């Protein structure tokens, strides 16, 4: 009976605004990762920009790198962009197709900067691909599930992330 309700009511949309997404991300940072057992990366809270024309989200991240071998610290910034996928089992939005659009670290040589720019995409894929960006509480989606809805497409709009709820097949 409830499945019929979803089919009669049609598609629904859940909107996560840019501010809500920014707030959710703020709770996950700073983020620390070791790379090659030589570098400690600390990533500050990102600034989110929605890219509706490409269906992606961009973030500007402040970065601190500690070189454990030389005992030096470097600061800089990184721009990444990504698409999103819904993980039904984990009830979360996760990063997919992560791209490092630019990386600049102050105080390093041009040669090291080039090497870091080449390593950046590999590091981003290894450390960020599939990373949860937004988690839902069970009750967030329980009502939709009870009415016969499931998560469909995720669209990036100027207003935020538009998550389509569609009738279950």
PLM-predicted stretches and their roles:
Residues 1-3:
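Sec-dependent bacterial lipoprotein signal peptides
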Residues 5-169:
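Extracellular/lumenal and peripheral-membrane lipid-interaction modules
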């Amino acid at each position: 009976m409830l499945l019929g309700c979803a089919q009669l009511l049609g598609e629904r949309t859940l909107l996560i605004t840019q501010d809500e997404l920014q707030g959710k991300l703020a709770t996950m940072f700073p983020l620390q990762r070791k790379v090659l057992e030589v570098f400690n990366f600390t990533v500050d809270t990102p600034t989110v920009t929605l890219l509706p024309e490409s269906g992606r989200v961009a973030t500007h991240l402040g970065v601190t790198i500690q070189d454990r071998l030389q005992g030096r610290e470097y600061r800089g910034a990184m721009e990444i962009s990504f698409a999103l996928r819904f993980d039904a089992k984990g009830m979360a939005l996760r990063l997919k197709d992560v791209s490092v659009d630019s990386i600049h670290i102050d105080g390093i040589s041009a040669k090291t900067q080039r090497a870091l720019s080449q390593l950046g995409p590999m590091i981003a894929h290894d450390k960020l691909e599939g990373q949860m960006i937004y988690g839902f509480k069970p009750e967030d989606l329980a009502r939709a599930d009870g009415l016969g809805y499931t998560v469909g497409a995720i669209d990036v709009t100027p207003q935020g992330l538009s998550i389509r709820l569609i009738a279950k097949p």
